[in-house]
């Protein structure tokens, strides 16, 4: 009996010890939970919870929503946090920054996607266009189901509310307009461009770097400017430049690294060659950002950037078509259709580049690219003489010139008339008008 009592006493003591261990473990788990929450709050830059609130923290296994959110943030960006040059402070600055991306196309798509993924606090996107099928090979933020829909449902009125602006518009009048706006609002501008197989990138109006007008007080003298719709673009190129724009925006937002201030990056997709060249600092005589600027906010509101650059901001702009010739040197597409239907001998010269001609052309045309026109004048004279021989003794041969949109053809007619082709005429509006007004089956590209 006595031995049995000793056994019962030993079991009671063991059970008491086990209960105490369980209590202490639970208390330790609760304290660990409090510690993790406070550490998370500290990492995210928030003020620590008061003791009364901290005492209400649930033990591990049932974390509070704040603790869960903090842990998710740390888990999501831990690869950033591991970078000694970036770390918690860089992520905190990025999460508190606001960046405006102007353009949601080939450049803006990767910019917006990566800035959002990297944790920018406020991301704005401005774009008035709608998604088109030929956008999808390079504008990776859009999908085919969105064709015809606005690229953004709402547009910011100005860049005033944002810390940094990214120009992803890729056209000349917008480039001037956004740069002027950033100077007037005193915002750094990350500017990139990509056309054909080449791209470039720089940071304007930041740490002494120039604005766009410092480098280009006046637009180029050529009446036409390069664009993706005119010159084409390899789909991946704006992705490369757009990612670099996102990188520069992050560097400016976090003050980490050395942004491309006073330097311009050039990228050649064919050779994969990248070079960085120095550009001039802010010009003291610049009318927008110089020592005595004369360009005011009122000037900005009233300034006609399309007229200034002789270039359109979008394909819907009324300035898209040039007007270089007198009326008697131009015919409408419908009038040219009457010439075709009449069977009168004539010469139709297609001055598009040869690779455009291979995409779609008119069967009776001859292709003489504008860049080769003066070199090929003897060939055209021979062709014109051959046509004249079929015109019932008439000496002159009517020459009609056509291009994609009716701009290059006007330049070509000027050259032809200066070189003796007095009956050369431009087919107004080019193949775009031809497809709309005469032959809807003609393949536009």
UniProtKB/Swiss-Prot annotation:
Residues binding ATP, per UniProt: 106, 127, 134-138, 151, 170-171
Recorded catalytic activity of this chain's protein: [molybdopterin-synthase sulfur-carrier protein]-C-terminal Gly-Gly + ATP + H(+) = [molybdopterin-synthase sulfur-carrier protein]-C-terminal Gly-Gly-AMP + diphosphate; [molybdopterin-synthase sulfur-carrier protein]-C-terminal Gly-Gly-AMP + S-sulfanyl-L-cysteinyl-[cysteine desulfurase] + AH2 = [molybdopterin-synthase sulfur-carrier protein]-C-terminal-Gly-aminoethanethioate + L-cysteinyl-[cysteine desulfurase] + A + AMP + 2 H(+)
Pfam family, one: ThiF
Gene Ontology molecular function: ATP binding; metal ion binding; molybdopterin-synthase adenylyltransferase activity; molybdopterin-synthase sulfurtransferase activity; nucleotidyltransferase activity; thiosulfate-cyanide sulfurtransferase activity; URM1 activating enzyme activity
Domain of life: Eukaryota
Active-site residues from the entry: 228, 403
EC number, UniProt record: 2.7.7.80, 2.8.1.11
GO biological process: Mo-molybdopterin cofactor biosynthetic process; tRNA wobble position uridine thiolation
Cofactor: Zn(2+)
Residue span, Rhodanese domain: 342-443
Record-linked CDD domains: ThiF_MoeB_HesA_family
An example Gene Ontology CC term for this record: cytosol
Cofactor detail note: Binds 1 zinc ion per subunit.
Compartments it resides in: Cytoplasm, Cytosol
UniProt keyword annotations, A-Z: ATP-binding, Cytoplasm, Metal-binding, Molybdenum cofactor biosynthesis, Multifunctional enzyme, Nucleotide-binding, Nucleotidyltransferase, Transferase, tRNA processing, Zinc
The protein's annotated pathway: tRNA modification; 5-methoxycarbonylmethyl-2-thiouridine-tRNA biosynthesis; Cofactor biosynthesis; molybdopterin biosynthesis
PANTHER family: ADENYLYLTRANSFERASE AND SULFURTRANSFERASE MOCS3, UBIQUITIN-ACTIVATING ENZYME E1
HAMAP family cross-referenced by the UniProt entry: MOCS3_Uba4 (MF_03049)
Family affiliation: In the N-terminal section; belongs to the HesA/MoeB/ThiF family. UBA4 subfamily.
Name recorded for this polypeptide: Adenylyltransferase and sulfurtransferase MOCS3
Organism of origin: Oryza sativa subsp. japonica (Rice)
UniProt gene name: MOCS3
């Amino acid at each position: 009996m006595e031995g049995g009592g000793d056994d019962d006493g030993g079991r009671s003591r063991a059970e008491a010890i086990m209960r105490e261990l369980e209590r202490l473990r639970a208390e330790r788990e609760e304290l660990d939970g409090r510690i993790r929450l406070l550490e998370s709050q500290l990492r995210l830059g928030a003020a620590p919870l008061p003791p009364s609130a901290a005492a209400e923290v649930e033990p591990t296994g049932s974390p509070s929503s704040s603790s869960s959110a903090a842990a998710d943030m740390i888990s999501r960006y831990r690869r950033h946090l591991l970078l000694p040059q970036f770390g918690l402070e860089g992520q905190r600055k990025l999460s508190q920054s606001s960046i405006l991306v102007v353009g949601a196309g080939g450049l803006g798509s990767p910019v917006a996607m990566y800035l959002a993924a990297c944790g920018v606090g406020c991301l704005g996107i401005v774009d008035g266009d709608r998604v088109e099928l030929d956008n999808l090979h390079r504008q990776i933020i859009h999908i085919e189901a969105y064709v015809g829909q606005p690229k953004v449902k709402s547009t910011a009125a100005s860049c005033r509310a944002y810390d940094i602006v990214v120009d992803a518009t890729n056209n000349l009048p917008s480039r001037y307009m956004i740069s002027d706006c950033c100077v007037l609002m005193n915002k750094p501008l990350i500017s990139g461009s990509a056309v054909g197989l080449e791209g470039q990138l720089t940071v304007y109006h930041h740490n002494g770097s120039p604005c766009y007008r410092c480098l280009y007080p006046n637009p180029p003298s050529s009446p036409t400017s390069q664009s993706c719709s005119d010159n084409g673009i390899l789909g991946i190129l704006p992705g490369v430049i757009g990612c670099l724009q996102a990188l520069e925006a992050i560097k400016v937002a976090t003050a980490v690294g050395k942004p491309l201030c006073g330097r311009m990056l050039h990228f050649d997709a064919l050779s994969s060659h990248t070079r960085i060249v120095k550009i001039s600092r802010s010009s003291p005589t610049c009318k927008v950002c110089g020592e005595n600027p004369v360009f005011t906010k009122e000037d900005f509101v009233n300034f006609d950037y399309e007229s200034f650059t002789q270039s359109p901001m979008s394909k819907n702009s009324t300035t898209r078509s040039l007007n270089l010739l007198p009326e008697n040197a131009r015919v409408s597409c419908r009038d040219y259709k009457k010439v075709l239907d009449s069977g009168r001998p004539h010469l139709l010269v297609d001055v598009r580049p040869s690779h455009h001609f291979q995409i779609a052309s008119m069967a009776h045309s001859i292709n003489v690219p504008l860049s080769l026109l003066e070199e090929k004048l003897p060939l055209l004279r021979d062709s014109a003489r051959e046509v004249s021989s079929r015109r019932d003794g008439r000496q002159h041969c009517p020459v009609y010139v056509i291009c994609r949109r009716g701009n290059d053809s006007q330049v070509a007619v000027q050259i032809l008339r200066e070189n003796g082709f007095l009956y050369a005429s431009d087919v107004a509006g080019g193949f775009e008008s031809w497809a709309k007004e005469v032959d809807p089956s003609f393949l536009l590209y």
